[in-house]
Amino acid sequence: VNEFLANLPYERKPKSLYEPIRYVLSMGGKRIRPTLMLLGYNLFKDNPEKILMNAVALETYHNYTLLHDDLMDNADLRRGHETVHKKWDANTAILSGDSMLVLAYERMAQCDEKHLAKVLKLFTSTALEIGEGQQFDMEFENRNDVKEEEYIEMIRLKTSVLLACALKMGAI
């Protein structure tokens, strides 16, 4: 996954839009989501290379959410590296993040045509849930009465739905 990500071309312009994307995706991380997708796929089929672009789509999407989360939290560091809005600026972080979302969809759409509708439906519903979780997280920062059930639901939406999506997509 790391090698595949590193070799993806970013030939479009402006360079200042795509440089932060390459930067974010080169920071590393555990790559749990693409790994889960590949493992889910490998339970049923023996050629995981076939869905490598889709696995990278999930990683691109995940990193898009981190880029925007860093901006919302005004974080200085991510994985020991300067965040995009600190290294460049907030506008670049927003635009590069938005472009990562589009790239994630473009990469996901490269799946087998017979599974495309199902995959995109799952991906879209998951993306909406993650946004809902992020909004709850932001709202909870201004509340002193957050119930445990609300907090757990926020964590489920922000974190577990994408992990579940990875396994489900692999199985599709």
Name these PLM-found stretches.
Residues 10-172:
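Mg2+-dependent prenyl diphosphate-binding active-site environment of isoprenoid biosynthetic enzymes
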Residues 1-9:
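N-terminal amphipathic/basic leader segments beginning at the initiator methionine
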